[in-house]
Amino acid sequence: MDDSVFISYCVVTGSFLGFQLLFSIISPRTFTKYSSTYRQLSFGKQCEWDSRCVSTTHALVVGSGCLYILAYDEAVNADPIWGDPFWVKMNVAITCGYLVHDLLLLARFWKVMRDPYMVCHHLAVFYSYGYVLNRGVLPYFANFRLISELSTPFVNQRWFFDVIGKPRSSWPVLLNGLAMALVFFIVRIAVIPSYYSQVFATFGTEGYIRLGIGPQVAWIVSCVVLDILNVFWMYKIARGFYKVVKAKPDGKPRRNHAD
């Protein structure tokens, strides 16, 4: 195992432990002390609250790193398949640590937090990012996929609004819903044509051939699975926002899976 791979797995471990600490100690103690709403929640809802705090923290850290790499990492942008992947690997390692934490959390509290779509999402990400960590390949495309995390804080915020009892017809909820739909569309849906045009542009190149069949299959299969899920979630978000906008002021729209 070379030094860069060893460092990557150290970051994965540190990331997992850090997010576990945030979930198990920092979040529950903080909100138990300062939030009366949190104290009144059931154990299952408190777990989901803490989980969404972890999710938002991960999204902000990794999303910011992605934007920095996209703007300033010339080596990765110049060679999307074999460019120097160090900072991308660090960002991916943080994400992998978070995914381990989240999968274990889902397994532990499956009856409360049941979400098979999220399990499929996490496994597809693991499948492809394993090659990034171990071989340092496809850094540009790995970073491009991680930008989608920028939509996560808005999704979580909608859940928090629901839990604290904010009416879905209130302006804070409507503005967050609009921002969520727009950001989700921009970072997960609108980029699909551009992303695949760049993918197809690499086909047949020397760099693509050097990858070998394993990374090639992992790259394409995981991308297709993730984009199917993203389109499905975008439909749910758009439908939910439409129902809220069309509902009467005192109406209570039904919840949907995108919640």
UniProtKB/Swiss-Prot annotation:
The chain crosses the membrane at residues 6-26, 53-73, 86-106, 117-133, 172-192, 213-233. One of its GO terms (cellular component) is membrane. Its main location: membrane. It is found in: Membrane. The keyword Transmembrane helix applies. It comes from the Eukaryota. It is a multi-pass membrane protein. Pfam families: TRAM_LAG1_CLN8. Residues 44-246 form the TLC domain. Keywords: Membrane, Transmembrane, Transmembrane helix. Belongs to the TLCD4 family. This is TLC domain-containing protein 4. The gene is tlcd4.
